Amino acid sequence: RHSSLHDALPISPYGAVLCHESAHVQVDECGAPEFFSSGSKLLLSPHRQGKLTSAGVLEVITRRTDIHYPRPKVVTLTQSTELGTLYHKGEVSSIARVAQAHGLKVHMDGARFANAVAALNCAPADITWRAGVDAICFGGTKMGLPVGEAILFFNRELGEEFSYRCKQAGQLASKMRYLSAPWLAMLKDDNWLHHARHANAMARRLADKISAIDGAEMLLPT
């Protein structure tokens, strides 16, 4: 995910990526986003139950515009979030409108994207390109693949030199076909959604069992 953010949306060293304090790129990548972008900064935006808000994003974008401060270039949001919550279509489009109005691109960390589509019972396009997302890292391992994620560009211009950035970042395997082939079976007949619905059902079953324990409650509604 850290390299997908860099590879899909090249960011200048003086640029900044907006995320929230629990975002995977912030807490679980050992500074890799900054490393792969030669020094760009992660700016933390307020969030509500693990979700960015358009108001919070706007506050960070407009906080400072002087040359002494990193220039916001990208907003990255995670669907489903690290806390198990979901962005609905209106929430994604609201954030995207703010970003686009100020010249920022929108990146989606879709490690659990299949779970979100299954839970929201919507078309994948409704919460991606139709809502203003420029690129998504479409998660494969959490759908059951042994390895591999797929980067999809909805803004085609961003992908013009993707192969070079991918190669430079060490993401071009000598046997790439072995990473690519499992996707054919995963996407056939909506297997990815079948797996996601099953995973969601098991998560709901676990949540219900925990909630039934005296004194136990779920941290967030998911």
Identify the role of each PLM range.
Residues P10-V27:
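Conserved PLP-anchoring active-site segment centered on the Schiff-base-forming lysine
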Residues Y87-A118:
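Catalytic PLP-binding core of fold-type I/II PLP enzymes
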Residues H2-L9:
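Short, small-residue-biased leader/transition segments that mark boundaries at the very start
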Residues D28-S38:
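Active-site-proximal loop->helix
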